[in-house]
């Protein structure tokens, strides 16, 4: 009897081991990174050209794959209350398909209300279990039909069977750049990313999207959409990413181009680490960037209301004003031949864990 039980237990263990090995092999087979310098086509291309001396509006908004309503928390986020209580997010997927669609439409309407000439959006799902297969890319492109657009994939993962009771699943997601003006070409540049055994299967395939627009007089307006790493202990990968971005910024300035780099920097870019009332301690992931960290001739266009309106909330707990930690991590870098004025938009974190940022600018 004992031998029989032992054989059964051994068989169960062997089957479990086969499943684990098979799953790891599946993840490894599915794993890849997109090549650097990948050219991307503009969909619905526009023909009007950008002009010097004319005022334009550009917007950036991380829509959080349509999951982050105010009552949402994300399983990978951790934190700590001021009294020392540890916190961790609960969910790996949107609360429901209905919530997903409501948040996506809410984000789209918020974007449309700003009437920007150029739009950067991050965490846009194209086909993902976490967003119930709601195609946010298609929804945004249809909703912004008067713009040319380009999509850069920066998250393509095999099926992640974790958390076990609510698996994150498979993901195809990325960034969308929209423009009412002619784009000459788009290039997806690869950021340095971690190749650690587990992390490489779960982290984004980080990139920045470079779009070149012709300007009267022979120069170019170079729009660079970025989404830097967040879950990077010690900030080493983020430092490498910033170094590469600075190389590109310096090269474009040498050529006399106009440059705007914007998006989700996952760093405090407005000296806002302790600007906003909070019942939580400052998260470990919050690092600071300022204009001194950028290539010569560049600056962060700090929003005039940066001390009043944050752009990002902690996702380890649902959002509650003056309780959940908030900070400014979204915005724009501009070259010194651009006049710019930015504003953080108070979206109340209703549809995303981010608020949009809008910048008015003029090419000098």
Predicted regions and their residues:
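Short proline/glycine-enriched turn/loop segments at secondary-structure junctions
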Residues: 198-200, 318-323, 346-350
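Surface-exposed cleft-lining segments at the edges of enzyme active sites
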Residues: 90-96, 124-128, 191-200, 227-236
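A well-ordered secondary-structure block
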Residues: 37, 156-220
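N-terminal, active-site-proximal structural segment of metallo-dependent hydrolase catalytic domains
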Residues: 3-142, 153-162, 166-172
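Solvent-exposed loop/turn segments at secondary-structure junctions
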Residues: 63-66, 124-128, 154-158, 183-184, ...
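Active-site beta-strand/loop signature of hydrolases that rely on acidic residues for catalysis
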Residues: 57-63, 90-93, 103-133, 178, ...
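Metal-dependent phosphoesterases centered on the DNase I-like endonuclease/exonuclease/phosphatase
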Residues: 232-336
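Conserved beta strand-loop-helix elements of the APE1-like EEP
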Residues: 142-145, 170-186, 213-216, 320-339, ...
């Amino acid at each position: 009897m004992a031998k029989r039980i032992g054989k059964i237990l051994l068989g169960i263990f062997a089957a479990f081991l086969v499943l684990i090995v098979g799953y790891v092999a599946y993840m490894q087979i599915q794993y890849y990174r997109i090549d650097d310098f990948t050219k991307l086509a503009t969909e619905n291309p526009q023909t009007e050209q950008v002009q010097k001396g004319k005022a334009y509006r550009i917007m950036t908004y991380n829509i959080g794959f349509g999951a982050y309503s105010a009552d949402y928390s994300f399983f990978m986020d951790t934190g700590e209350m001021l009294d020392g209580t540890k916190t961790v997010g609960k969910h790996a997927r949107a609360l429901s398909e209905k919530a997903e669609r409501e948040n996506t439409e809410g984000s789209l309407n918020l974007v449309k209300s700003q009437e920007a000439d150029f739009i950067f959006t991050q965490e846009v799902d194209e086909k993902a279990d976490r967003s119930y297969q709601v195609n946010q890319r298609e929804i945004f492109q249809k909703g912004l039909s008067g713009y040319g657009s380009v999509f850069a994939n920066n998250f393509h993962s095999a099926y992640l069977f974790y958390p076990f009771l609510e698996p994150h699943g498979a993901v195809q997601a990325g960034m969308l750049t929209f423009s009412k003006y002619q784009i000459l070409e788009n290039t997806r540049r690869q950021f340095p990313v971690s190749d650690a055994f587990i992390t490489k299967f779960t982290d984004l395939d980080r990139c920045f999207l470079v779009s070149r627009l012709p300007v009267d007089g022979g120069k170019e307006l170079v729009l660079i959409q970025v989404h830097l790493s967040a879950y990077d202990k010690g900030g080493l990968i983020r430092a490498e990413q910033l170094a590469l971005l600075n190389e590109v910024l310096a090269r474009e300035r040498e050529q006399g181009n106009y440059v705007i780099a914007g998006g989700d920097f996952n760093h405090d870019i407005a000296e806002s680490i302790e600007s906003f009332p909070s019942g939580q301690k400052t998260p470990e992931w919050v690092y600071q960037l300022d204009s001194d960290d950028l290539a010569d001739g560049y600056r962060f266009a700090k929003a005039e209301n940066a001390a009043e309106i944050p752009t990002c909330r902690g996702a380890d707990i649902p959002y509650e004003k003056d309780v959940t930690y908030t900070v400014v991590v979204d915005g724009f870098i501009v070259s010194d031949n651009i006049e710019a004025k930015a504003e953080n938009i108070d979206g109340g974190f209703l549809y995303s864990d981010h608020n949009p940022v809008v910048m008015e600018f003029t090419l000098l």
